[in-house]
């Protein structure tokens, strides 16, 4: 049994009008897991039309995985401005996914509210976009209309600045807020990041995976945050990816 699992839908992403590409938190997390050599498994879902291509892409990473295909693939189109602010549109929505996993540390990487059932595990990291992103087609909408029961059993909540502003105060054992190019805050302690001029897509997912891997290895929260920040900066600048199979 691997010590760490990442679960969530894969997505079909169109960035700045380019050709569609594989995306989603469970995909971007593999980049950090490969760089760290983590003992991990990916448990992902996609639509039947994308199954063959997405299965091949996951296989190339070298990370053990399960891929469940049914219905449609969640799809997004988005772009970034000069300071990294993202404009995003929901083009298609997949059916909810309820995976079974056996791991002590689980990263739950939803794309929209309600699209992944949070499993029971000793340590669960939940990405806050699964709380605030409305499952509706069109321009991405955020609100705080989520069931607070979703946080029951969550050990670590990872939010972006925008998500944190929507949710407001929250009571969880560990709170991680990412600030894009400005680093992150872990339980109130700010962690700086080395600025990198690169496509930031998936940086939050990589941070979450690296953070959880560090916690699983025994690091305390702030130490894990510093480790994750360094990993993401290195990955975005390609310093950890050279010579390795990666997404």
Predicted regions and their residues:
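Short, charged, surface-exposed secondary-structure boundary motifs
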Residues: 76-77, 133-139, 186-188, 198-205
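Active-site regions of enzymes building and remodeling cell-envelope glycoconjugates
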Residues: 60-66, 88-89, 103-106, 121-126, ...
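Histidine-anchored nucleotide/phosphate-binding helix
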Residues: 24-35
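Charged helix-capping and loop-helix junction motifs
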Residues: 22-25, 139-145, 192-193
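Conserved N-terminal subdomain of the carbohydrate kinase-like
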Residues: 2-6, 11-20, 34-115, 119-123
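Conserved beta-alpha-beta core of the PfkB/ribokinase-like small-molecule kinase fold
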Residues: 105-170, 181-183
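Short, conserved phosphate/pyrophosphate- and ester-handling motifs at nucleotide-, phospho-/glycolipid
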Residues: 33, 160, 204
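Conserved post-catalytic alpha-helical subdomain immediately downstream of the catalytic base
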Residues: 174, 194-247
């Amino acid at each position: 049994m691997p010590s760490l699992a990442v679960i969530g839908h894969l997505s079909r992403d169109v960035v700045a009008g380019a050709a569609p590409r594989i995306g989603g938190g469970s995909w971007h997390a593999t980049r950090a897991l490969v760089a760290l050599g983590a003992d991990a498994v990916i448990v992902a879902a996609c639509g039947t039309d994308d199954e063959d291509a997405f299965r091949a892409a996951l296989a190339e990473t070298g990370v053990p995985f399960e891929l469940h295909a049914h219905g449609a693939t969640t799809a997004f189109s988005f772009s970034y401005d000069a300071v990294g602010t993202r404009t995003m549109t929901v083009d298609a929505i997949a059916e909810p996914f309820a995976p079974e996993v056996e791991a002590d540390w689980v990263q739950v990487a939803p794309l929209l509210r309600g699209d992944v059932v949070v499993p029971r595990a000793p340590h669960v990291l939940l990405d806050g976009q699964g709380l605030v992103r409305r499952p509706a087609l069109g321009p991405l909408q955020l609100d705080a209309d989520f069931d607070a029961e979703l946080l029951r059993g969550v050990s670590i909540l990872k939010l972006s600045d925008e998500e944190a502003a929507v949710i407001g105060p929250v009571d969880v054992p560990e709170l991680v807020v990412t600030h894009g190019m400005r680093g992150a805050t872990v339980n109130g302690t700010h962690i700086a990041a080395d600025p990198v001029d690169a496509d930031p897509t998936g940086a939050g997912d990589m941070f979450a995976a690296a953070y959880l891997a560090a916690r699983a290895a025994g690091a305390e929260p702030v130490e894990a945050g510093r480790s994750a920040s360094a990993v993401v900066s290195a990955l975005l600048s390609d310093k950890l990816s050279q010579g390795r199979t990666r997404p």
